[in-house]
A protein has these predicted regions:
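Conserved pre-catalytic core of RNA-dependent polymerases
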Residues: 1-132
Length: 133
C-alpha cells in the first residue's frame, strides 16, 4: 500500500519541485549536481559575473518536520484530500516513550518527524524543504 501511495504522491510532488531539486529523486544524482555547479561557475567567469552558492545541511532533518505544518503544505499545493487523509491516518496516534539512565518516561504523542525508513519520508521532506525556501 505504501508503494502505491508513494507513486501517487510523487506525481504531485514532482510537479511542485523545480528541476534543480535533485535530492531523493529518481534519475538525479550527485554527479549531475556537481556538473551543474561547475557549469554555473564557468558561465559566471565567462560573463565576468559574481556567483553565490548556499549549501544547507539539514541536521536531524527528518525529525524536525511538524505534522500540522506538513498537512497545511499538502493542502496548499493541492495534494488531493484522499491522499492527505491516508497520510494523516498513517501518522495519527503515534506515541513514544524514552528510556534513560534514570528510568522510562511516560508515553507521549509524536507531533514531529517523518517515519524513519518509510518510502514516503523523502518525498514528504522534499516537499516541505521546497516550501520553506
Amino acid at each position: 500500500m505504501l508503494k502505491i501511495l508513494q507513486a501517487r504522491l510523487q506525481q504531485y510532488v514532482n510537479y511542485e519541485l523545480p528541476d534543480v531539486q535533485a535530492g531523493f529523486r529518481k534519475g538525479r544524482g550527485t554527479r549531475d549536481q556537481i556538473s551543474n555547479i561547475c557549469w554555473t561557475i564557468e558561465k559566471a567567469r565567462e560573463l565576468q559575473k559574481n556567483v553565490y552558492f548556499c549549501f544547507i545541511d539539514y541536521a536531524k532533518a527528518f525529525d524536525c518536520l511538524g505534522h500540522n505544518k506538513l498537512w497545511k503544505i499538502l493542502k496548499e499545493v493541492e495534494i488531493p484530500d484522499n491522499l492527505t487523509c491516508l497520510l494523516r491516518n498513517l501518522y495519527a496516534g503515534q506515541e513514544a516513550t524514552i528510556r534513560t539512565e534514570h528510568g522510562t518516561t511516560g508515553w507521549f504523542q509524536i507531533g514531529k518527524g517523518v517515519l524513519q525508513g518509510c518510502i514516503l519520508s523523502p518525498c514528504l521532506f522534499n516537499l516541505h524543504a521546497e516550501y520553506i525556501m
